[in-house]
Structures are given as structure tokens and as C-alpha cells.
UniProtKB/Swiss-Prot annotation:
It comes from Clostridium tetani (strain Massachusetts / E88). Pfam families: UPF0261, UPF0261_C. This is UPF0261 protein CTC_01794. Belongs to the UPF0261 family.
């Protein structure tokens, strides 16, 4: 059976460019399914799924969208419709990849549809916006974004090279052999930051030596969301959540938040989770000159040229502790909270720049007061989070939960 590639985009404004990509893909022996998400103009390339069908699936009609003249509403309808169709095609047809190109509108619609596909299916997005902040488009999925350099307006010497590269990149991904994500060993999701790396690596090695495969997610916002998504997809069977720092950014206003649903998936799916307040001593910002004026006089630490850390206060830790405690109370089964009494990160240790006994005490007390002990086991240890004893204790607890 031929591998099928979805080509999705606004065929009224970018028909020539999509045909260029389509011809390359089909020349390499792959089948294409073209989806039109344009609204106003006539498609310049015949689609397999036209814009009328996309609009209907999205809850409206093309006629209604044109009549309303509301670009935002039209975008929302076409995003919903295209995502639903892409998801259905993946389930029914066994889609092998997806590619698109566009400006702000096309990128928003196509990337939304791409995020409906599971991790591992190749996704390539050629965009005029790919050199800026791509977080709204990539989200927690493995979307490859390629900067178009020039506006996507016809085929010329430069655009033909860029579009060819994009098409052949997708072809290579689709034709290449990759191992299946689901392996024989049970998958465990773990969260890590630079300041919790030592502890996480110790726990990871212990888990792997005991027959588990560990996927480590960098707790940068996108990492936390990616782990939550894979938990809900059913891939991950247990969670070693040693680094819950994304809640600092969510509560205080840093740049690496994972959104308000972090720490929900494991409870909702009913899988074992062992959690620690890793790196809850810090809020993340970009280069030091980008730190908001209101925080300029706080305890700041230049982690590197592009990352500035800000020490959390007692008041912030109380608020963070309440939120995390409430999230853990969603647990249906097998949940433990490990508290490292000698610090939650490498720089929250005695003599280090973020060491704060009172701040940590406020955090720990709030967690203990908020957590429902009938649902969540609390384990306090006289260690720093990176100590071997602490890390192995967390790993052992998770194994016990998963094997009982």
C-alpha cells in the first residue's frame, strides 16, 4: 500500500506552490491527499477534500463564512474542520506525513491541524513566521518548521529551492525507517531541568536497570505539555515528575509555563506518579535585560546568556504549593509526593545562590496542608533533590506502584 501524504493549505492563494510540492512528492512514489482550507477565492489546484467539506466539519459553511466577513471566525472554523479531517484520515487511511506552507493565516490553520496527529508522524510547515516565536504553532508536537526566507508568492529561483528542500525533507522522513515509539519495555515519563539533572539521571539509570524505558522531558513549558500529551495518548505508563518548575512560571509570570493543565494527565489516566517539587525555587526569563521591571531588584541569577532565573519568595511558594497540592488531589490511585528537605535544586542547597530555608519551608508546609493524604502519600527526606538516596527512593517507589 502506498504511503499517503496530506498536503493542506489555502489553495486559492498558494495553489501554484502547493502543486510544486505535490509534484515532487508524487514523483517519489508517494500518494497525496490535498485539503483546501482557503475561504474566499477559487482553488488553483484541485483538492481531494474541498473547502466546503472542511467548513461543514468545522461547524459552519463556506457561504456563511464569506457572508460574515469575519476573518477570525473563519480561521477558527477552518482550523477545527481541518484538524478533525486530518485526525480521521490518520485513523482510517494510515497517514504517513503532512506538509503545508503559508503566512500567518495558513500557518495557524495548518499547524493546528498538524497538532491533531500523534507524535512520530512527520510534520513539515514552511512558514514566513518560522524565524520568530514558533511556540504557538509547534505546541507540544514534533512539527518541523522551515523559514521561507521570502514571502510565499509564486515559484522563483529561491522559493523553488526552499520548497524542494521541504518536500524532500518530508519524503526522507516518510521513507526512512524509525523504531516504533511503543517498545517492549514500559515507558516512564520523567521531567528534568539543568538544576535537577543529577537527580533525574540517577533515578533514570535505576529505572532502566530494572527493565523500564525512560523518556526525559525538559521542563521548559513545551516539555511539560508534551509529556502530558503522551500520557493521555496512552504511551506513558508511569511518571517520575521530579521537576515541576513550570508551575513557577505559570503562577508568577515567567516564560516557561506549561499552562493550567500541567499535572493533570497522570491523575486523569489513573497511572502511577511520583512527584517532587523540583526547581520550584526559580522563575525563568530570557536574557537579563528582558526581566520585567517589577522584578529587577529581586534575587536574579544569570544561568547563561539567554536564561535568567529569579528566586521565588515565600508568598509565591505558598501560592505554588496550593496549586500543585490541588492538582495532586485529582489522583485516582498510586500517587506519592517526595519532599527534599535540603533543597529543590542544585542552587537551592546550603551555600548556593538560591538557598532559602524559609522559602522552602513555606512551600513544603503548604504542600502538606493542601494534599489529601488519603489519596497522596507524602514522603519527607533529609536530602537535596539531587542526592542519590532521594532519587533512588523516588525510583523505587514508582517501581513498587507499577508492579503491584
Amino acid at each position: 500500500m502506498n504511503k499517503k501524504i496530506i498536503i493542506l493549505g489555502t489553495l486559492d492563494t498558494k495553489g501554484e506552490e502547493f502543486k510544486f510540492i505535490k509534484d515532487i512528492i508524487e514523483k517519489e512514489g508517494l500518494e497525496t491527499i490535498v485539503i483546501d482550507v482557503g475561504v474566499v477565492g477559487e482553488a488553483k489546484l484541485r483538492p481531494n477534500i474541498d473547502k466546503k467539506e472542511v467548513a461543514i466539519v468545522g461547524g459552519s459553511s463556506i457561504e456563511d463564512l464569506i457572508k460574515k466577513k469575519d476573518r477570525g471566525y473563519a480561521m477558527e472554523v477552518m482550523m477545527k474542520g481541518s484538524a478533525a479531517i486530518v485526525k480521521r484520515l490518520s485513523k482510517e487511511e494510515g497517514i504517513s506525513g503532512i506538509i503545508s506552507l503559508g503566512g500567518s493565516g495558513g500557518t495557524s490553520i495548518a499547524s493546528y491541524a498538524m497538532r491533531a496527529l500523534e507524535v512520530g508522524i512527520p510534520k513539515v510547515m514552511v512558514s514566513t513566521l518560522a524565524s520568530g516565536d514558533t511556540r504557538p504553532y509547534v505546541g507540544e508536537k514534533d512539527i518541523t518548521m522551515i523559514y521561507s526566507v521570502v514571502d510565499i508568492s509564486g515559484i522563483n529561483t529561491l522559493s523553488s529551492k526552499i520548497l524542494s528542500n521541504a518536500a524532500y525533507a518530508l519524503i526522507g522522513m516518510v521513507k526512512g525507517k524509525a523504531p516504533e515509539l511503543k517498545g517492549e519495555k514500559p515507558l516512564i515519563g520523567a521531567t528534568m531541568f539543568g538544576v535537577t539533572t543529577k537527580g533525574v539521571n540517577i533515578a533514570k539509570e535505576y529505572l532502566e536497570n530494572n527493565g523500564y524505558e525512560v523518556l526525559v522531558f525538559h521542563a521548559t513549558g513545551a516539555g511539560g505539555r508534551a509529556m502530558e500529551d503522551l500520557i493521555r495518548s496512552g504511551y506513558i505508563k508511569g511518571v517520575l515528575d521530579m521537576t515541576t518548575t513550570e508551575w513557577c512560571d505559570e503562577v508568577v509570570g515567567g516564560v516557561l509555563n506549561a499552562g493550567p493543565n500541567r499535572l493533570e494527565a497522570a491523575s486523569d489516566m489513573g497511572i502511577p506518579q511520583v512527584v517532587a517539587p523540583g526547581a520550584l525555587d526559580m522563575v525563568n526569563f530570557g536574557p537579563i535585560e528582558t526581566v520585567p521591571e517589577e522584578f529587577k531588584k529581586r534575587n536574579l541569577y544569570k544561568h547563561n546568556a539567554t536564561v535568567t532565573l529569579m528566586r521565588t519568595t515565600k508568598e509565591e511558594n505558598i501560592e505554588i504549593g496550593k496549586v500543585i497540592g490541588e492538582k495532586l488531589n485529582r489522583a485516582k490511585k498510586d500517587t506519592a509526593l517526595f519532599i527534599p528537605l535540603k533543597g529543590v535544586s542544585a542552587i537551592d542547597a546550603e551555600g548556593e545562590v538560591f538557598y532559602g530555608y524559609e522559602e522552602d519551608k513555606a512551600l513544603f508546609n503548604t504542600l502538606k496542608e493542601t494534599v489529601n493524604k488519603d489519596k497522596v502519600q507524602i514522603v519527607e527526606m533529609n536530602n537535596n533533590i539531587n542526592d542519590e538516596e532521594f532519587a533512588i527512593a523516588m525510583a523505587k517507589k514508582l517501581i513498587n506502584m507499577m508492579e503491584k
